[in-house]
């Protein structure tokens, strides 16, 4: 690990009330003393106690170019576990950049992306799952997603995995003693005891894996295709969900010829909406290309909102769309419920998770759709304060552990002997150690921290 003192802007770029430049490393106080002069000449930066603040001026040589506050943190009681000084200057890129340049001229090195959190991990201040949660919390733009990240940052996932590891470790100790030291008269484990422990662990891992997709939706959002025949109300729906006139709406069929994109927040879920061209047979080459893109977006989407005209009978295009949505996370929206209904929803009901009568011009339908989307994607069943998996790395490790425990259960039921059970339990423990970062290679650590921005 590099033990140099590093400096970087820790706040988002652009104009703002303040900007923070963070120093971390053994020379943080010495560097700060060169670039920050307390307003009270009796105060010395080098002698500042942890968890204290001083007001003063930021210096480049003999020139004071700004005034602000320095916050001091003594090792190991800091984010990184090192001496840390946070220098708060006026916001805007010019002043903050000049302050960083002054710190570098005074002996600090520029921080790499994620280097502060990487040092926190290497110094034992955070586990790997907690470090990953830092990035999730920074990226969160919904309350539930932020709560999930905060729970992991506070150790919810590490504690949950730790409990399953403890159960398997105790089981493995007994298995090892019985297999390796038969002369010691170690009592054999009863199959019922083995099955009970393994089943409990497998159930906990199954729950984590089952909830992964809903957690990912809350953290990352989901791509949502709005599809249907021309003039069914797709663009009106886009405008309703967006809260403003994002797409052009006219009585002319085929107004939308290309995909119109808009990110919206529906309840606590971020939807990346794709309003698509109306699905119909056409001789127009441009419209045909738009329709091809519509089908492509439908196939790629994590959520489908299929819009049907409730004031007209089902058509061949409607039936083709319903068949294409079968088995997918799709909701049928029978639009124009304010008009006499000619649409037989029962014919398509089996192809959709749910069928909802709506009026895409009314705000009440927005609330109905939001509740249905949350129910379909499972986000309303998530406890935001519970342990949850984040990212493919964690999911893959948890899945390997679950499959190994399932293999141990198969070994018990198949009568393959305790040696076979022990091998499977070992594999499960290795996978759980990979998840928590105890077995993490340098490549894995690099992959985790390359997602971070400079300054965190």
Where does each model-flagged region fall?
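A glycine-rich (often HGG/GG-containing) alpha/beta subdomain
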Residues: 1-147, 151, 155, 331
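C-terminal-of-GTPase-core extension/linker across diverse P-loop GTPases
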Residues: 2-9, 13, 143-265, 282-284, ...
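Short, Asp-centered acidic motifs that coordinate Mg2+ and/or phosphate
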Residues: 271, 303, 331
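Generic enzyme active-site microenvironment
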Residues: 273, 307, 333
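Inter-motif core of Ras-like GTPase G domains
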Residues: 287-311
């Amino acid at each position: 690990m590099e033990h140099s003192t590093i400096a970087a802007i820790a706040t988002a770029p652009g104009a703002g009330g303040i900007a923070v430049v963070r120093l971390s490393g053994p020379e943080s106080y010495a560097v700060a003393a060169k670039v920050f002069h307390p307003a009270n000449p009796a105060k010395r930066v080098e002698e500042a106690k942890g968890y204290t603040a001083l007001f003063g001026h930021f210096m480049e040589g003999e020139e004071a170019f700004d005034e602000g506050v320095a916050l001091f943190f003594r090792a190991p009681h800091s984010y990184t576990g090192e001496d840390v000084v946070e220098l708060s200057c006026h916001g805007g890129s010019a002043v903050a950049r000049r302050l960083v340049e002054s710190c570098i001229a005074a002996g600090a090195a520029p921080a790499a992306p994620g280097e502060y959190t990487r040092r926190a991990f290497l110094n034992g201040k955070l586990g790997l799952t907690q470090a990953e949660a830092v990035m999730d919390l920074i990226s969160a733009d919904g309350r539930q997603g932020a709560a999930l990240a905060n729970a992991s940052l506070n150790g919810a996932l590490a504690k949950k995995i730790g409990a399953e590891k403890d159960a398997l470790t105790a089981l493995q100790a007994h298995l090892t003693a019985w297999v390796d030291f038969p002369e010691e008269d170690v009592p054999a484990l009863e199959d019922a005891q083995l099955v009970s422990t393994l089943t409990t662990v497998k159930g906990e891992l199954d729950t984590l894996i089952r909830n992964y997709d809903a957690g990912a939706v809350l953290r990352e959002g989901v791509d949502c295709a709005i599809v249907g025949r021309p003039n069914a109300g797709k663009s009106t729906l886009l405008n309703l969900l967006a809260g403003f006139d994002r797409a052009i709406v006219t009585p002319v069929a085929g107004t939308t010829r290309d995909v119109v994109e808009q990110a919206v927040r529906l309840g606590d879920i971020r939807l990346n909406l794709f309003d698509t061209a109306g699905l119909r047979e056409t001789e127009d080459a441009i419209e045909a290309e738009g329709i091809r893109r519509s089908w492509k977006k439908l196939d790629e989407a994590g959520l489908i909102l299929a819009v049907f005209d409730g004031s007209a009978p089902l058509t061949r295009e409607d039936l083709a769309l319903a068949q294409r949505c079968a088995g997918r996370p799709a909701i049928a929206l029978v639009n124009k419920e304010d008009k006499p209904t000619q649409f037989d929803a029962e014919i398509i009901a089996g192809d959709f998770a749910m069928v909802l009568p709506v009026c895409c011009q009314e705000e009440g339908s927005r609330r109905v759709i939001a509740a249905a989307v949350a129910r379909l994607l499972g986000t309303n069943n998530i406890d935001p304060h519970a342990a949850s998996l984040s990212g493919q790395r964690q999911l893959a490790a948890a899945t390997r552990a679950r499959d190994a425990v399932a293999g141990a259960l198969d070994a018990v039921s198949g009568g393959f002997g305790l040696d076979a059970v022990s091998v499977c339990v070992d594999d499960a423990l290795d996978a759980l150690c990979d998840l928590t970062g105890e077995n993490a290679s340098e490549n894995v650590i690099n992959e985790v921290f390359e997602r971070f921005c400079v300054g965190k």
